[in-house]
């Protein structure tokens, strides 16, 4: 592993052993602490990322999508992924966006998002959609700043919470 300067923040593709587990665990721990979710959050993230990695192995090449991690001082502190949007052919779906609080405010969230959007453009997607839940104000601000617009908002029971599930879309 290359040495990094103190405070060094990077984004790279999640291809190292432990990357997926770390990002899934971060989702489980941080969402439980910050929003009160249960263990199904971590399981949902782990299952989706595992499905992506296994599909990439079957299909070869770029497969159905990619996953990136954010690192701070060489430690994984977040991640984001882009997959084909099953519900909207010709579009991508942004998934698993998260940053540890110690890494927030350093531009890493924007870098993860821009990396995923660059991949969507390279795949010639007509747009990108994402699903989120109400109350994730910092994430929603980041998405809106990138041009995403709220298109669906509905009550839902997700991850042990009564919440509002939201879909946001960005035309490319």
Residue ranges and their predicted role:
Residues 3, 16-19, 126-172:
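C-terminal "cap" of GNAT-fold acetyltransferases
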Residues 1-8:
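Acyl-donor-binding surface of acyltransferase catalytic domains
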Residues 100-106, 134-135:
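Active-site acidic-Proline motif in GNAT/NAT acetyltransferases
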Residues 89, 107, 138:
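Residues that form or flank phosphate/diphosphate-binding pockets in enzymes
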């Amino acid at each position: 592993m290359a040495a990094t300067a103190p405070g060094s923040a990077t984004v790279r593709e999640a291809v190292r052993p432990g990357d997926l587990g770390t990002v899934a665990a971060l989702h489980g721990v941080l969402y439980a602490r910050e929003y009160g979710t249960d263990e199904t959050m971590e399981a949902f993230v782990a299952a989706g990322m595992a499905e992506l990695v296994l599909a990439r192995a079957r299909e070869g090449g770029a497969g159905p999508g990619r996953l990136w991690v954010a690192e701070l001082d060489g430690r994984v502190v977040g991640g984001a992924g882009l997959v084909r949007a099953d519900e909207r052919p010709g579009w991508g779906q942004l998934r698993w966006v998260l940053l540890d609080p110690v890494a927030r405010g350093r531009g890493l969230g924007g870098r993860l998002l821009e990396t995923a959007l660059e991949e969507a453009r390279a795949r010639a997607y007509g747009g990108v959609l994402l699903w989120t839940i109400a109350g994730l104000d910092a994430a929603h601000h980041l998405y809106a700043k990138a041009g995403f617009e709220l298109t669906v908002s509905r009550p839902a029971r997700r991850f042990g919470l009564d919440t509002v599930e939201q879909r946001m879309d960005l035309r490319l």
